[in-house]
Amino acid sequence: MFARYLPPSAEKFPAQFKEKDALITPWRILPISILYNTELLKADEAPKSLEDLLNPKWKGKISIPDPSRHTTTAKFFWNLEKLMGAQWREYVKGLAKQQPLLVESLAPVTPAIIKGEVQVGIAYIKFVKQYKGPVSYVSLNKYLSDPNHLALGAKAARPNAGRLYIEFAVSAEGQKMIAQDGEFVLAPGVFPPIQGAEKVTPNMIPMDNPSEDEAKSLSNEFRQIFFAKDLGLPLDLEGAVET
């Protein structure tokens, strides 16, 4: 499906984001944090960690994507094992008890925060730059992050043009252009115009992708955790609800 190609400019990218087979090349990475409304909360009033979101004072004041439908959020919760170990499931259950405003993806979380529908939410840090309004992010010790990749088709009609495009996207010039829009990139020393971005990059942890079967299982599990009570179903009933 893909042809092996390692663009020269990507050789200096952090090792943890490189693919060993060189079939795909990372061009940006999307760190996730807690975003908050700066008009409703001062910086010292915002949650200090993901665990802080379980404080009763945030009940009904949080927005997250519906993890039973949004695959990136399901992946984020699943990868919390990297930060919380086996307790990650209990964390997700605790978050569900906070009665969060569930939206369809990460993008609508930020407008909900800006409009004051909620005070805090889980979303990409880049939205602080990409949405206009009173919103900032919480500095965490580690950031689960979603790498995005470019690849050269094995049967590309114009493979040289494809190589040139990929090389430009990961070159210093290309990475600077991409970063100006709030994107976190992998070129050393290149950061988006977001306060504290240089402290985010060294603490990004790439998320693993669940298999297709694992993804289906996670969707069912999160549907039970977040909706089983509303549906009148026991929480230990596996795979009972399909949409």
Q: Where do the language-model regions lie?
A:
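Extracytoplasmic ligand-binding site segments that recognize negatively charged/polar headgroups
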Residues: 1-117
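Periplasmic-binding protein-like
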Residues: 15-16, 30, 57-68, 92-96, 102-103, 169-191, ...
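Solvent-exposed loop/turn segments at secondary-structure junctions
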Residues: 32, 40-42, 60, 68-72, ...
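A ligand-binding cleft/hinge motif common to bilobed small-molecule-binding domains
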Residues: 114-137
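Substrate/cofactor-recognition hotspot
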Residues: 165
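Conserved C-terminal helix/tail region of periplasmic/extracytoplasmic solute-binding proteins
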Residues: 212-243
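A bilobed periplasmic-binding-protein/Venus flytrap-type ligand-binding module shared by bacterial periplasmic
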Residues: 33-40, 147-161, 177-178
